Amino acid sequence: MVLTVPMFLPTTAKEIEILGWDRPDIILITGDSYVDSPYVGISLIGKVLQNAGFRTAIIAQPHMDSDRDIARLGEPRLFWGISGGCVDSLVANYTASGKKRKTDDYTPGGLNNRRPDRALIQYANLVKRFFKNTVPIVLGGIEASLRRICHYDFWSDSIRRSILFDAKADFLVYGMGEKAVVELAEALRNGDPVHTIRGLCTISKEKITGFTEIPSFEEVRSDRHKLTEMFHTFYGNNDPLTAKGLFQKQDSRYLVQNPPQPYLTTEELDAVHDLVYARALHPYYRQFGDVKALDTIQFSIPTHRGCYGECSFCAISVHQGRTVRWRSEKSILQEAIRIVEMPEFKGTITDAGGPTGNMYGFECERKLKKGSCPDRRCLYPKICPNLKINHSPLIRLLKKLRGIKGVKRLFTASGIRYDLILSDKNNGRLYLKELVNFHVSGQLKIAPEHTEEPVLRLMGKPGSPSLLQFKKEFDALSKKSGKNQFLTYYLMAAHPGCTENHMRSLKRFTREKLKTTPRQVQIFTPTPSTYASLMYYTERNPLTGEKIFIEKSFRGREAQKNLVMQKEK
């Protein structure tokens, strides 16, 4: 069954009444406003649950000072599902320099005044304050996923327990949770056991037979070598084909992480995205102002999930996985047609992509059968020969999307891996030609992040020769096509191992080789469950044990950024 009505999930008592419900089965709570879009996790999960037959409602950004929001729909029959939003609430609320962010792209009106710090903990406490002895509280989303085991927390500069313990919740769904959350809802409805559901974290009083024990909270809090040992085991048990269940002692009880759910197949991904999304802000929240994020995602199409880039500072590997999965052409084209039929659509599809724009349609055959390699990366230090890069499926898809009546422009806004383009000897240049001629809005995003080899090695990023070769070919094709187009370079300051001298060299490179003054320079933020955050806390390369320089002062971190961004006198 494909969901067609209602287009929005209910968020008010009036909507519940119109639907004829006595109460919802499930109430989802989120730190973002309710934008009904396949790009917004809480919306997608809500639609999947509703399509599975569960009466699902959403409460977005509830007020924390009373029950006026949290109690307006009553108590759900099965469970409360809580997400901090599309990004970790502390990342959303604070800059890398510890300053409070004034604006928020997911809050109506744009002011950052509706999402509490540590939103999962705050919302769980809010539920328990007004609903005593309530139904289970289930955590999900990126904040839950990355904080599911003991982790380094940059904002308190400390090792924290699993968010499942700190929020005093009942269950935690990690990763892309469509399968796990439906299985959990069915089990709770039927009174069946839940503790074997894949993709679920639970709490146990006992050790779990057959699962792997990782160093305890007390051990990793007092011993940085134990933290490194813990993270290696955690990171190595994220692939559904090879992962074992894990458990970790936290105080007198144990966190239990079941093995991950199998990745969605193409058919399953299609089914999720073939559900109808309003691609708009719910009218109840629209009265409080516009949501800026909608400008980016309203007319964009997600084509694939996962990333095998494995950049040290990126959390996608732990949340979405290292195996890329993609939707069928048919499903993507049907979504484009639905977008064209929207009254607000003016002819421009702002993006068709995924975490990395040009990973659609090909994967390592060995990985698909046996799982990710435990001892090597797909792209670093060089591209693995087992990965047969082939841009032809993406070229074909883009051509078909351009051919849809009503589509005037189709842009690639997702960042691309230029090393993949250069390594695809058969179709890489054809793809680049397609990009230059049809899919660049004036600037094409690429993320070299740095140019200095010691820093790139710790990041897991390709070297500068491939960057210069790509720039040369992009500029030549743009000139040939008569288009005034540029590359936008995303760069990073203060990554573990990066010194001011490295940033001076980066500045010199951008001036002399790239002929630009960078405008997109971010300061590294140690987010939970990444290798770069492990480096930041331990001050060592986790793969070699080598001691590395870490810039930890806010002043020094800002200085690194300013070295690159300052204009020449």
Task: Give residue ranges: language-model regions.
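N-terminal [4Fe-4S]-dependent radical SAM core
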Residues: 2-23, 33, 228-300
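Nucleic acid-processing catalytic cores of prokaryotic defense/repair systems
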Residues: 24-30, 37-74
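Conserved SAM/AdoMet-binding glycine-rich loop
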Residues: 28-30, 44, 59, 63-64, ...
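N-terminal pre-triad scaffold of radical SAM enzymes
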Residues: 29-35, 286-315, 333, 340, ...
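Glycine-rich beta-alpha loop elements in corrinoid/cobalamin-binding modules
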Residues: 41, 60-250, 257-258, 262, ...
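Terminal amphipathic helices with adjacent charged low-complexity linkers/tails
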Residues: 65, 194-227, 231-238, 261-264, ...
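Flexible glycine/acidic-rich beta-alpha junction loops that bind and position SAM and/or redox cofactors
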Residues: 88-97, 146-148, 178-183, 323, ...
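Conserved, mostly hydrophobic/aromatic
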Residues: 170, 272, 307, 332, ...
